[in-house]
Amino acid sequence: MTKRIALATGGLYQAMSHLQGEVKKASANAGLDEKLIELVKMRASQINGCAFCLDMHAAEAVAAGEAPRRLYVLEGWRETELFTEQERAALAYTEAMTLISDHKDVPEDVYAEAVRLFTEDQYRALAWCVVAINTWNRLMVASHAELPERAE
């Protein structure tokens, strides 16, 4: 892979890191489970093909207590009963937001299920989580970010 200019540096990177910190705080304050957030980050990263973020968030998910088996089958989440109703709603919402250019909107049924299963604060935090991971994915993919020796 051709080496490219690193995009995750400088003041804009610091601003993005600050945004990520605010998203993490909002998620915690809203009572969103850390494992659910990591599933969301992993699913968006799968769709976007971001190996750097997949590596990072798989390690963070396991550290948060996520079962590796669920990570192995995450791409096929609809085909298994391993995910809760709330996790399924979050994953469907993540896919809709990540692939928004396919529909030009979040489908009404996906939105309705998300707001049925999450409080308003949780829904807002979930939306910002999806926005943030999609931004990170694009930065890492565009700059050909290399994997560290060990997932961090």
Regions found by a protein language model. Name each.
Residues 1-152:
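Hydrophobic alpha-helical segments
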